[in-house]
């Protein structure tokens, strides 16, 4: 009604970006589950899903994957067809930090790995074919700081804006 009252016939519209989320780590248990010894509830996936939805995207939560190359590779396949792929955990330099290695086998081209900030230093960015990829650290605070600083502006571009505000 408002557009018609202003005699505006054409309005730009953009589809919501579909963003796949994969949480990784043998230590993670899905919310509602019972953590065993040395396990924690995986909160990054639900937090990112809410963040993505609040910022105009459609969250595709792929759940939790263990630190297993075969499983991680098959989960990466499920992200294909999305507009963006985000993982949490597995991007630092520990023995179980295998995201970069596994996703390179799935076609990941790394644009950069590591940023000069804390929290969030081991952030990974690249592309799997035309799909952008962000690998966030597993720490929940690091994940959400990286989402605000890196994912939110990327989502704005995917939503068609030509003006991306500095998130900080």
Where are these regions (language model features)?
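Short glycine-rich anion-binding loops that position phosphate/pyrophosphate groups of nucleotides
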Residues: 26-27, 90-93, 138
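Flexible glycine/proline-rich
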Residues: 102-168
């Amino acid at each position: 009604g408002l557009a018609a009252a202003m005699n505006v016939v054409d309005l730009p519209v953009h589809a919501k970006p579909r963003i796949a989320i994969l949480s990784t780590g043998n230590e993670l248990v899905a919310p509602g589950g019972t953590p065993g010894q040395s396990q924690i509830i995986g909160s990054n996936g639900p937090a990112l899903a809410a963040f993505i939805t609040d910022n105009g995207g459609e969250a595709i939560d792929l759940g939790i994957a263990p630190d297993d190359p075969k499983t991680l590779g098959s989960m990466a396949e499920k992200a294909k067809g999305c507009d963006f792929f985000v993982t949490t955990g597995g991007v630092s330099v520990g023995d179980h930090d295998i995201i970069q290695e596994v996703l390179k086998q799935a076609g990941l081209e790394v644009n950069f790995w590591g940023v000069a900030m804390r929290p969030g230093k081991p952030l990974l960015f690249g592309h799997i074919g035309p799909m952008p990829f962000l690998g966030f650290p597993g720490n929940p605070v690091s994940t959400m700081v990286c989402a605000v600083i890196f994912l939110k502006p990327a989502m704005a571009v995917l939503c068609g804006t030509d003006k991306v505000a500095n998130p900080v």
